[in-house]
Amino acid sequence: MSEKYVVTWDVLQMHTRKLAARLLPAERWTGIIAVSRGGLVPAAILARELGIRHVDTVCISSYDHDNQRELRVLKCAEGDGEGFIVVDDLVDTGGTAQAIRDMYPKAHFVTIFAKPAGRPLVDDYVVDIPQNTWIEQPWDMGVSFVEPLSGR
């Protein structure tokens, strides 16, 4: 990846609330399925904003920090997804998204960020990201002191 896009906690919450507004009225949803781990934080925000208490997970391993590797399904939520919002932080190449579509064909699949290759696989997203950009999520970063350039 040649570029980095840094996401702060407040920006993530703002984008997720924007997505939640598009998912109203909340009564049409049975629950949320969070794609672990990237979809866990957005799922918590969506659950709060929509008043949804039924939250499950599908656990798929496809990244090792910044290296994409083979998909492994570690845990599935039951059913075909009918009445459920499936949420992940990002759709990238579409590998994970296609697996989600195959497992939950009747779900409404949303992400916060979408890259061109995976965009056709999601029902809704908030932010367009160039394909060659790595997203640094707030849960992968910490705040630290930076020495002034002048050394004072």
Curated annotation (Swiss-Prot):
Its UniProt entry gives the catalysed reaction(s) as: GMP + diphosphate = guanine + 5-phospho-alpha-D-ribose 1-diphosphate; XMP + diphosphate = xanthine + 5-phospho-alpha-D-ribose 1-diphosphate; IMP + diphosphate = hypoxanthine + 5-phospho-alpha-D-ribose 1-diphosphate
| Topology relative to the membrane | Peripheral membrane protein
Positions of xanthine binding: 92, 135
Q: In which residues is GMP bound?
A: 69, 92-96, 134-135
Residues that bind Mg(2+): 89
Q: Does the keyword tRNA-binding apply?
A: no
- What cofactor does its activity depend on? Mg(2+)
Q: Where does guanine bind?
A: 92, 135
Superkingdom of origin organism? Bacteria
Q: Which keywords fit this entry according to its UniProt record?
A: Cell inner membrane, Cell membrane, Glycosyltransferase, Magnesium, Membrane, Metal-binding, Purine salvage, Transferase
Give the UniProt subcellular location, in the record's own words: Cell inner membrane
Q: Which SUPFAM superfamilies match?
A: PRTase-like
Principal subcellular localization: membrane
Query: What GO terms in the biological process aspect are recorded for it?
Result: GMP salvage; IMP salvage; purine ribonucleoside salvage; XMP salvage
Q: What does this protein do?
A: Purine salvage pathway enzyme that catalyzes the transfer of the ribosyl-5-phosphate group from 5-phospho-alpha-D-ribose 1-diphosphate (PRPP) to the N9 position of the 6-oxopurines guanine and xanthine to form the corresponding ribonucleotides GMP (guanosine 5'-monophosphate) and XMP (xanthosine 5'-monophosphate), with the release of PPi. To a lesser extent, also acts on hypoxanthine.
Family the entry assigns: Belongs to the purine/pyrimidine phosphoribosyltransferase family. XGPT subfamily.
Q: What is this protein called?
A: Xanthine-guanine phosphoribosyltransferase
Report the source organism.
Edwardsiella ictaluri (strain 93-146)
Give the gene that encodes this protein. Answer: gpt
